[in-house]
């Protein structure tokens, strides 16, 4: 398996974002009792943004962002970005099915 180049990663994240709405991220945060900062970090990871860029604009250190990410992952029960995306996709599909029933 070859690693993705930057263009492929960008295309993948753009495709991913079309399916993952802010509502789904909110559901995840509510379900797992994430803090506001943990919610923001999860959104950063899902968007494909880099902590370095966010730290520069947001005023939080990379270590702080990493700690918030680790805490969110522990609460959600995932151990890496891929597991997070799988979980968010699952939650998204579940939310879509529930919305279609109502």
Stretches found by the model and what they are:
Residues 49-82:
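Recognition helix of helix-turn-helix DNA-binding domains
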């Amino acid at each position: 398996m070859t690693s993705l180049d930057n263009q492929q990663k960008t295309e993948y994240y753009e495709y991913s974002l079309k399916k993952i709405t802010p509502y789904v991220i909110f559901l995840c945060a509510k379900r797992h009792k994430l803090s506001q900062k943990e919610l923001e970090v999860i959104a950063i990871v899902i968007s494909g943004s880099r902590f370095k860029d966010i730290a520069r604009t947001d005023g939080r250190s990379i270590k702080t962002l990493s700690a918030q990410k680790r805490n969110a992952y522990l609460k959600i029960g995932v151990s890496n970005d891929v597991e997070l995306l799988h979980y968010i996709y699952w939650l998204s599909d579940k939310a879509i099915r529930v919305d279609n029933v109502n």
